[in-house]
Amino acid sequence: MLSSIYNDKCKHLIIVSYQLPVSLKKVNNKYEITWKNSRSSIANFREIDSNINKIWIGTLEEDIPIEDRDEVESLLKTYNCIPVFIEKRLKYKFYYNFCKGLLWPVLHYSIPLTNDVNYSKNWEKYWGSYYVVNSLFVKKICIFLEDKDTL
């Protein structure tokens, strides 16, 4: 059983994904959290043996105002979720421009063909957003990563 392997050698199983497996909404000035439906591929990790201590690190679909972030982070900790807050504009450049616009086609064998010499130059500005977002994830991981954790 997976838990026997991890309990002997691992303190926590830290699951890092772009998005956390939860949804968040504000009702009557209070945030409510629900697990995303099980059709989400990342949500399937919730099914890993309950004896394994899991910590989730990732972003939320929802944009959280700066003044609400401490409250949201506290609520998410009750779900073993650690948010990486990314500003909306940076998130867009990272996800839609670099990941979906460049990485996804390259990794799925649909490399765009073009004679436009400026095409590759445009990616340089999106590389910066990719680098910054990954740095935010690394900083958050380093805060919570402990000896004997599995990442």
Indicate where each model-derived feature is located.
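N-terminal low-complexity, Ser/Thr- and acidic-residue-enriched intrinsically disordered segments
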Residues: 1-91
